[in-house]
């Protein structure tokens, strides 16, 4: 079940649901929810963030991985990740769930 946006925790897990398709186009990607027909475009950094989030056990694990990969202020990365998660969640393009 999806969390309300205000209660997103870095211990939570992000997944792309089965009814959402991701199409990579050179340096960006387009994400489409087949049920709602909503879509969202991501640049190469957003695409990488989503890929790491979707394959990690938690938002925190994805954050740590991306912090090692990119030379960026950690607070900026944390804010950018939360912004991306909130936007994709509002569009119904990801699910956020509590880790057990």
Model segments located where?
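Acidic, low-complexity/disordered tracts enriched in E/D and polar residues
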Residues: 1-47, 51, 97-100
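Long, charge-rich, low-complexity alpha-helical segments
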Residues: 38-100
């Amino acid at each position: 079940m999806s969390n309300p946006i205000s209660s997103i925790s870095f211990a939570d897990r992000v997944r792309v649901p089965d009814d959402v398709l991701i199409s990579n186009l050179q340096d960006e990607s387009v994400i489409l929810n087949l049920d709602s027909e909503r879509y969202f475009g991501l640049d190469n950094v957003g695409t990488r963030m989503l890929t790491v989030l979707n394959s990690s056990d938690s938002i925190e694990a994805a954050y740590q991985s991306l912090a090692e990969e990119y030379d960026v202020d950690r607070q900026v990365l944390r804010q950018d990740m939360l912004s991306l998660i909130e936007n994709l969640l509002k569009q119904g393009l990801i699910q956020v769930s509590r880790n057990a």
